[in-house]
């Protein structure tokens, strides 16, 4: 098997069936994730998204098939390499309370480092650095249970950053936050991703979260319907509808303008750019 050197993740012919089900939860799915990019997997509830997250981390093992492949950072997932894979993948779940193990914020962030037997001076330096990156330095002595939902997710993200994984999976990690909290966390993660060249695989039923991804995967009933850039995915209205999803507001407006004969350049890919472009267009009339 030949791997693209820039792909941190390669998945081929991945299927998984739960023991109490006759129908596969994931059906012959193949995709790749380039290093240092943001890929978003979207699909309605029950489409198989979280199952894929657990398969990538070796929490679940795929159905037996000689053509099936999960390769992360050059390591092919098997029962023998399961722990090597888990060393390279960090997951932030939707409920951070389920991830907390430390009595204080700094203890919790240090937990993964302690398991890796990182020397204490280096550990303290890493903990301080990641807490600073997520804006939680002033809460290092706080007990996690007394933090707000957004603060808890910041601590969970810090704990993942501390161990330096090759791939960070966000499994519905903002679904329990209010819109303002969700916006702040996504803005923070995008900032960290660009500054640290992180590879992000976000999983969500909220298609609005996918607008700024480099790549979108559309999943429905365990099958991968499409894999493309946000611009090309959101141009295909029938694809979005067939997946039981709805277009982000920006693309609804953009598509309606295009259908009315107004040419919108491809680089106009945000609400701010669209408003600016329309104002410029109006001034020329």
UniProtKB/Swiss-Prot annotation:
Keywords: ATP-binding, Cell membrane, Membrane, Nucleotide-binding, Translocase, Transport. Residues 9-246 form the ABC transporter domain. It is a peripheral membrane protein. Coiled coil: none annotated. GO terms for cellular component: ATP-binding cassette (ABC) transporter complex. Its main location: membrane. ATP binds at residues 43-50. Gene3D superfamilies: P-loop containing nucleotide triphosphate hydrolases. It is an enzyme of class 7 (translocase). Its EC number is 7.-.-.-. It is found in: Cell membrane. GO terms for molecular function: ATP binding; ATP hydrolysis activity; ATPase-coupled transmembrane transporter activity. The keyword Nucleotide-binding applies. Belongs to the ABC transporter superfamily. Energy-coupling factor EcfA family. ATP-binding (A) component of a common energy-coupling factor (ECF) ABC-transporter complex. Unlike classic ABC transporters this ECF transporter provides the energy necessary to transport a number of different substrates. Forms a stable energy-coupling factor (ECF) transporter complex composed of 2 membrane-embedded substrate-binding proteins (S component), 2 ATP-binding proteins (A component) and 2 transmembrane proteins (T component). This is Energy-coupling factor transporter ATP-binding protein EcfA1.
